Swiss-Prot record:
It catalyses: (R)-4'-phosphopantetheine + ATP + H(+) = 3'-dephospho-CoA + diphosphate. Pathway: Cofactor biosynthesis; coenzyme A biosynthesis; CoA from (R)-pantothenate: step 4/5. Its cofactor is Mg(2+). SUPFAM superfamilies: Nucleotidylyl transferase. This is Phosphopantetheine adenylyltransferase. Homohexamer. HAMAP family: PPAT_bact. The lineage of its organism: Bacteria, Pseudomonadati, Pseudomonadota, Betaproteobacteria, Nitrosomonadales. The gene is coaD. One of its GO terms (cellular component) is cytoplasm. One of its GO terms (molecular function) is pantetheine-phosphate adenylyltransferase activity. InterPro entries: Cyt_trans-like (IPR004821), PPAT (IPR001980), Rossmann-like_a/b/a_fold (IPR014729).
Amino acid sequence: MSQLKVVYPGTFDPITRGHEDIVRRAAGLFDHVVVAVAKSPGKHPMFTLDERVDLASSILSDCPNVEVLGFSGLLMHFVREQGARAVVRGLRAVSDFEYEFQLAGMNRQLFPEMETIFLTPAEQHMFVSASLVREIAQLKGDISQFVSPLVQERITLKLA
C-alpha cells in the first residue's frame, strides 16, 4: 500500500496555534505531512526562513510523521520534488475560500495530477492569522492564546 504524502505550505510568520491545529489534523489523516515554509521575500517577514523553519520544527517535534522544510520558487515544483500527491490548505472563513478556490483551480490547470485538500481549524482558531498576531504583538498586546510560548518568547525578543 502506498504512503499518502501531503504538503502544507505557508509563510508561517509566525506559526500560530491555527497552523499547528491544521498540521496536527493533517498528521492524523495522512501518512506523511511536509510543512513547507515559503521564503516569501515579498512579504518582508518578521522572522528569517531559517527561524521560521526552526520554530515550526520545535513546535511540531512530537509529530513523528511531520517534516518541516523551507522552500522558494513555485509550490507545485516543490510538491513534485517531495513526491507528494496533494496540498493541504487551511480555511478559516468564507473570505479565505474565494482565494483558495482560485488558487486550487490554477494549480489544477498547471498540475492536473495534484489535489488540494481543505481543512478547517478548531473554532477557537478560526480567526487567528499570523499578520494579526504580529500586529497585536507590535502594539504590546497579549498574543498568548494565539501562539505557543516559544513563539511568544521569540516575538518578544524580535520586538525588544
